[in-house]
Amino acid sequence: MIVKTLTSLGHAIIDSIWRLGVASSFIAKVLTRSSIVLRRPRLLVDEIHFAGVLSMVIIVVSGLFVGLVLGLQGYETLKRYGSTGAVGTLVALSLVRELGPVVSALLFASRAGSAITAEIGIMKTTEQLSAMEMMAVDPHARVISPMFWGGFISMPLLAAIFSAFGILGGYLITVVVIGVDGGAFWAQMQASVDFYHDILNGVIKSVVFGFAVSSIAVFEGYSAVPTAEGVSRAVTRTVVTSALAVLALDFVLTAFMFTGGV
């Protein structure tokens, strides 16, 4: 029993390492075919619209409600200590450091990442990618690379929008509804949030998350089994793997950015 369990675990580890190597080789190939996005920027613009603009609604609404909850919870906590003016700092730091990049990346993986995987998988199932190869059109350059870069560019922008609307939500619930002094809200935020230590590190996080989610989405779509069930499984793997990757990367980046390493 123990031997069988260890054997299965070993096979799973070896398979994961092999799949990671295949994925790395695939992404390297996609990156080497990226010149097409400069020669034909329309392809990139279309993919930014597909991955970014069409994700705006869920990002804006989610960011607003997260900000409302943060403001309400922060106010109730700080009220006990007579520091309600610092609620702006709590909301802003929570969003720009953590919740903005992480939650927007999870939402991006669920909405855009799954859609990218499904589109590539369906193109593979209907043999559109094979038809491109027969016509001497490289699908990595024509299809995969623009999708990858569209997701990669969209992710940091969506994270910034999420944080902005989150701060707006925090302002609305604490200043407009509850009655916290608006001047103290903004003054405390401006005094406590540092551009390089807080905002820039949050942007770096969102860039890393964008690379990870976009890489996983295009790889899972291209490697999907060309059947309806295969595409469905690939979409599921994209969402699950992206979520785990984002959370793991968030821990690593936070450890080095804000604590100097563990």
Identify the role of each PLM range:
Residues 36-61, 240-243:
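Membrane-interface helix starts
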Residues 235-253, 257-262:
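Helical hairpin unit composed of two closely spaced alpha helices linked by a short loop
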Residues 50, 58, 62, 84-116, ...:
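Loop-to-helix entry region at the N-terminal start of transmembrane alpha-helices
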Residues 1-43, 220-225:
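Short, membrane-interfacial amphipathic segments enriched in basic
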Residues 62-65, 105-109, 145-174, 208, ...:
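Hydrophobic alpha-helical transmembrane segments that constitute the membrane-spanning cores
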Residues 73-96, 164-207, 215-235, 257-262:
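Membrane-interfacial helix-loop-helix connectors in multipass membrane proteins
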Residues 47, 138-159, 234, 238:
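Start (N-cap) of specific transmembrane helices in multi-pass transporter permeases
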Residues 120-145, 228-231:
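Short cytoplasmic-facing helical segments at TM-TM junctions of multi-pass membrane proteins
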